[in-house]
């Protein structure tokens, strides 16, 4: 294939011109991807549907060349390439890839992922069978890249941010979904928040669940997350991004008239509860290093929710402790899964008051009272 990297980037044209619209656009953010991109591209070839998909490599200003690894696939897959103006954030790289997408369905893969053979055929068949118009989600495997051993099967788990397929016309374009370019982390969670709001507007609260394993997620350190910060401190270090991608995303969509107030309220209070458990866990594990500014971010978010949604601390607590405290417990479990040990040192209501007092007096429910209500 007599094409060079700069020609592909400059023109945005595919290495192979398809005579019809591809079913899938697979967007792959790349950065110094030479060690892993071969396995990923070969796994796409092994889907045996190369005439029905396009691959978009979106490079985030790599400092190490890897085009020699891509070149052998230029006559096997319809490959497009693009490059960001400067190295900044993962959302910016993904957004650049979306601009070139022409497929009916979008999906995103990290450069060290590997698709399981022929799984995209099953995804396509199931989407068509059930005539899904918006969003589909499948399972994935967490794999040790050194041994190839499966560490866990991510199947109908709390983590719905991965193995998702988005309809380009009915969902992505219709609801004007874009990555938030200034997020250094949690860009996938932000997209999930936007998609959830769009599905709510479309009266389709749940994506189509496809019970198959779609790809292997290689559980290795990356320059963006664990290599630099570790699993635990990563969330603490980028807590502001977490709030931007979750709570703020929902409340902003309510302000734009895209979702009802109750849906935004549910999301906002869920984020506050998770933040409560997160912050207590951080302080318990390492009180000296805990980032004090995270409390400032949380205080700003709580005040924002009160101003936009008309919430009070009493209402937030009552909402969280309602229905046998199932909502409260759900967030506690999610937090424990995310950061490990959860050791609350104060009640949720006291924590809310610590962040921001309501003007009017109210009664504080103690931990023992909460336990009684839970019964």
Regions found by a protein language model. Name each.
Residues 1-12, 279-375:
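Membrane-interface aromatic/basic loop that binds lipid-linked glycans or pyrophosphate carriers
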Residues 7-12, 33-46:
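Short, well-formed alpha-helical segments that are part of the catalytic scaffolds
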Residues 52-61, 80-84:
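Short beta-strand/loop segment that forms part of the nucleotide-sugar
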Residues 59-68, 86, 110:
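A conserved acidic beta->alpha catalytic loop
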Residues 84-101:
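Glycine-rich, basic loop-to-helix element that forms the pyrophosphate-binding segment
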Residues 106:
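Short aromatic/hydrophobic "clamp" motif used to bind/position activated sugar donors
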Residues 118-150:
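Conserved donor NDP-sugar-binding/catalytic core segment of glycosyltransferases
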Residues 153-234:
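Conserved nucleotide-sugar donor-binding catalytic segment
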């Amino acid at each position: 294939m007599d094409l060079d990297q700069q020609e592909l980037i400059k023109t945005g044209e595919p290495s192979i011109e398809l005579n019809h619209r591809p079913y899938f656009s697979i967007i792959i953010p790349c950065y110094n991807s030479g060690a892993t991109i071969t396995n990923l591209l070969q796994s796409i070839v092994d889907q045996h549907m190369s005439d029905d998909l396009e691959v978009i490599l979106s490079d985030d200003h790599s400092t190490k060349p890897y085009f020699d690894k891509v070149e052998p696939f230029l006559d096997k897959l319809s490959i497009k390439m693009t490059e960001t103006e400067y190295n900044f954030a993962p959302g910016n790289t993904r957004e650049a890839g979306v601009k070139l997408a022409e497929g009916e369905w979008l999906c995103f893969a990290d450069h060290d992922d590997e698709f399981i053979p022929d799984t995209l055929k099953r995804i396509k068949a199931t989407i068509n069978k059930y005539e899904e118009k918006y969003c589909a989600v499948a399972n994935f495997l967490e794999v040790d890249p050194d041994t190839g051993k499966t560490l866990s099967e991510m199947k109908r788990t709390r983590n719905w941010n991965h193995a998702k397929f988005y309809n380009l016309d009915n969902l992505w374009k219709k609801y004007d979904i874009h990555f938030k370019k200034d997020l250094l982390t949690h860009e996938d969670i932000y997209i999930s928040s936007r998609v959830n709001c769009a599905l709510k507007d479309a009266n389709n609260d749940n994506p189509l669940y496809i019970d198959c394993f779609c790809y292997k997620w290689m559980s290795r350190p990356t320059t963006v997350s664990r290599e630099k910060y570790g699993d635990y401190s990563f969330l603490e270090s980028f807590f502001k991004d977490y709030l931007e991608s979750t709570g703020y995303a929902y409340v902003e969509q309510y302000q734009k008239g895209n979702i009802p107030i109750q849906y935004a309220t549910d999301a906002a209070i869920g984020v506050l509860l998770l933040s409560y458990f997160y912050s207590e866990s951080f302080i318990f594990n390492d009180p000296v290093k805990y980032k004090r500014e995270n409390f400032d971010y949380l205080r700003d978010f709580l005040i924002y929710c009160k101003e936009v949604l008309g919430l009070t601390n009493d209402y937030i607590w009552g909402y969280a402790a309602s229905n046998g405290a199932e909502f409260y417990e759900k967030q506690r479990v999610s937090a424990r899964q995310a950061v490990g040990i959860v050791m609350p040192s104060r009640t949720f209501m006291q924590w809310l008051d610590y962040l921001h007092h309501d003007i009017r007096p109210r009664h504080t429910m103690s931990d023992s009272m909460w336990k009684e209500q839970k019964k």
